[in-house]
Amino acid sequence: MLSIVDNRTFKRLTYRVLDHDPTHVDITAFFRRFHAALTARGLTVKGITTDGSALYPGPIAAVFGEIPHQLCTFHVIREVTKAVLSAVAQERKRLAATSPKLPRGRPGTKVARRAVRRKEAIKRKVGELFDHRYLFVRRRLSPSQRATLRRITRGRPQLRRLRELMEEVYRLFDRRCRMGTALAKLATLRARLRRSCRLRSVLKKLMSPGLEKALVFLDERLMGATSNAVERGNRRYRKMQDAVYRVRTKRAIEDRLALDLLRESQAQGRASTTKALHKARAA
């Protein structure tokens, strides 16, 4: 299902339901139909936000020309957070592998008792890293959460560097800075990653050449940073398809989308009517 949604009002503007995976031809035809509808009304597209799919750049340039094209920041941050959590999991495995193997029976010697204490300490450390793993990727941490993070990363500087890098990634997408400032921060971050083989292999997404497109919204104040408006509407239909068998066909989805567009066009009139009825009833 292809959809174009106004990122300011979160209203669906046009749609097309396909019975196959979309191709460049489908995307181009979809954009041309939308462009023709805008031209007939004297409107133009000033910018567009999409996910990171390779299907969009070619058709956008062919139909709309040179317009600002923003990649959804949510998808970029999601890939980075997944990589950071994976790195934390690898560190847990490395830490668990250092746990000493104990012989059977009660520890009778001082060395054996020391090994038991070390094994329990490592097990406790691994458990804490698992229980509090999301502290490494949260956007904002409270003072108590920061204290917990310092405690569980004590003696593990590589884990603290992961959290520092995550904070730098969030600062890249701060609306208070301009795109030029963000690009300078990104260049500094990439240089730092090149000096660390382990971090470079973990955060490959930050080295991708198309990441700059995720920072376009910093200079375009009216442009949405994410494509959540489209995904929220599509998610509603995916959820509906799980429960209502009739909505799974192409024809049923088209009819349901058309009905939703009709309801949205009449929403303001319904609100005015409801307000007038409440006012008359209260009089």
Name what the model sees in each region.
Residues 32, 88-92, 108, 262-265:
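Short alpha-helix boundary/capping motifs
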Residues 21-22, 90, 244-246:
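A short hydrophobic/aromatic micro-motif that marks alpha-helical segments and, especially, helix-coil
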Residues 39, 43, 50-57, 64, ...:
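Acidic/histidine-rich catalytic cores and adjacent linkers
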Residues 1-49, 54-66, 87, 229:
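RNase H-like nuclease fold core
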Residues 20, 24, 35, 69, ...:
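Histidine (H) residue identity feature
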Residues 51-54, 59-104:
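Conserved beta-strand -> loop -> alpha-helix junction used to position metal-binding or nucleic-acid-contacting
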Residues 14, 76, 245-246:
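A generic structural signal for short coil/turn motifs at secondary-structure boundaries
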